[in-house]
Amino acid sequence: TRLEDFDYRSLDTTSNTYKTISYKYIVFAEGYRVSENPYFNNLPISPTKGELLEIEAEGISDEFIYLGSVFVQPIGKNKWRIGSTYQQNDSSLNPTDIMKEDLITKLNKGVTKPYKVVKHLCGVRPASEDRIPLLGVHPDIENMFIVNGMGSKAVSMAPLLTTEMVNYMVDKVPLPKEVDLSRF
């Protein structure tokens, strides 16, 4: 296993090599940074920033709670994750005070127990044009694939969709038409 920035210039799709590594298949799962991928940069993926809070409190249900505009997810003893915001076409990775206050205001409408904010986090979702994940093969390179568009709703489907992707790659089992990138 290696962790490095991918250098597209080092990918040779004729010899199926990346630097010194030979491959049978290559799968890109780059999230919102797919726009930097010369093989798939035409896909309708846009960045959608989201911010979360982590809180500590006693007396809140240990069950996942949806309060209409925010969720309260248990992540440990007396710890919860609160989210989330949606800032379209924003790929900055800095949490903002305005979104923190927005989450606190929404949380206060449903949680009456005292709590302490211990973390304020943000990330960027890869949002597809139709908010449905994108899976499939490159139109010209038969062993190059993509799994993308796993925004906030689709991320829960990731285990199933990646299994479907492997079945498609290895056994040529068709992908569900709803997620097949050929729809674009």
Language-model-detected regions and their locations in the chain:
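Hydrophobic/aromatic beta-strand patches that form the interior of the parallel beta-sheet core
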Residues: T1, V27, F145-V147
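A structured beta-alpha segment of the ubiquitous adenosine-cofactor-binding alpha/beta core
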Residues: S15-K19
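Active-site substrate-recognition segment that forms the wall
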Residues: E30-N143
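C-terminal catalytic lobe of FAD-dependent flavoproteins
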Residues: K116-F184
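A conserved short coil-to-beta-strand element within the FAD-binding core of flavoproteins
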Residues: T1-T14
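Short hydrophobic core segments
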Residues: I21-R33, T162
